[in-house]
């Protein structure tokens, strides 16, 4: 909202399949469904604006990264701002999820459901904090797809906002992907956030103190790219 207001831009939020509902719905997600969601969102963006700026967080960043290497999947995108992009989770054994019997092994080790405690009312309201562990399989598959993507041929300028203290995803891979990125790019490491995991590094729920600063950083970057 803050970025769109500052740029006087139209704004469209997309909701990836399975998200924003109850825990059971999370199992409905798939890599193909999320790619379709992304392409639909870009089509809407092209319809309501002259240029499309993508702001992608966490596994949304995985999706935007893969799409940036597929010309037909990122047509019309002028820039991408990544916030804590997911190029590999830190959870031990995550790579087993996409192996044969990955779902069965995950359920045997961790149970059929995953959950985490919420930290405040906004966290409780806007996060799905209990869901089938099977819902993590497409997340891992998309993460692997993004990490293996030939980002050297990316032509879309990118801004990577992340924390080296991220306890959820691997910041070393963010630095690696940025180093391989074929188009102009910038790294914005963030040290102090409100999130104890240093993953949700902006937003009223977990990191309100950094929201304004990071929104302004994105605005300055976009204006420099677009000559505003």
Q: Locations of the language-model features?
A:
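Gly/Ala-rich beta-loop-alpha elbow adjacent to hydrolase catalytic centers
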Residues: 55-64
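Active-site nucleophile elbow and catalytic-triad environment of alpha/beta-hydrolase enzymes
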Residues: 133-150
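Catalytic active-site module of serine/aspartate enzymes centered on a nucleophile-bearing elbow/loop
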Residues: 194-228
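Conserved alpha/beta-hydrolase
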Residues: 4-22
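Short beta-strand/loop motif that positions the catalytic acidic residue
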Residues: 154, 160-162, 166
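Catalytic nucleophile-loop/oxyanion-hole region of alpha/beta-hydrolase
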Residues: 21-48, 53
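Active-site nucleophile loop of the alpha/beta-hydrolase fold
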Residues: 81-92
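Short alpha-helix in the alpha/beta-hydrolase fold that links the catalytic acid
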Residues: 156, 169-180
């Amino acid at each position: 909202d803050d970025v769109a207001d500052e740029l006087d831009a139209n704004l469209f939020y997309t909701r990836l399949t399975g998200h924003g509902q109850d825990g059971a719905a999370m199992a409905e997600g798939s890599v193909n469904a999320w790619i379709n969601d992304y392409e639909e969102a870009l089509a809407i963006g092209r319809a309501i604006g002259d240029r499309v700026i993508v702001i992608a967080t966490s596994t949304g960043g995985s999706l935007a990264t893969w799409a940036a290497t597929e010309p037909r999947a990122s047509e019309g995108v002028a820039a991408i701002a990544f916030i804590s992009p997911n190029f590999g989770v830190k959870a031990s054994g995550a790579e087993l999820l996409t192996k044969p019997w990955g779902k069965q092994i995950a359920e045997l080790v961790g149970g059929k459901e995953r959950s985490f405690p919420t930290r405040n009312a906004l966290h409780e309201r806007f996060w799905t904090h209990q869901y089938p562990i099977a819902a993590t399989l497409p997340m891992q598959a998309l993460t692997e797809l993004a990490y293996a993507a030939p980002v050297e041929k990316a032509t879309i300028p990118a801004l990577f906002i992340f924390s080296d203290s991220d306890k959820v995803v691997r910041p070393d891979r963010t630095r690696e992907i940025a180093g391989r990125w074929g188009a102009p790019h910038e790294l914005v490491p963030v040290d102090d956030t409100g999130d104890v995991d240093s993953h949700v590094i902006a937003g009223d729920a977990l990191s309100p103190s950094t929201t304004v600063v990071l929104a302004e950083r994105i605005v300055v970057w976009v204006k420099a790219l677009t000559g505003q």
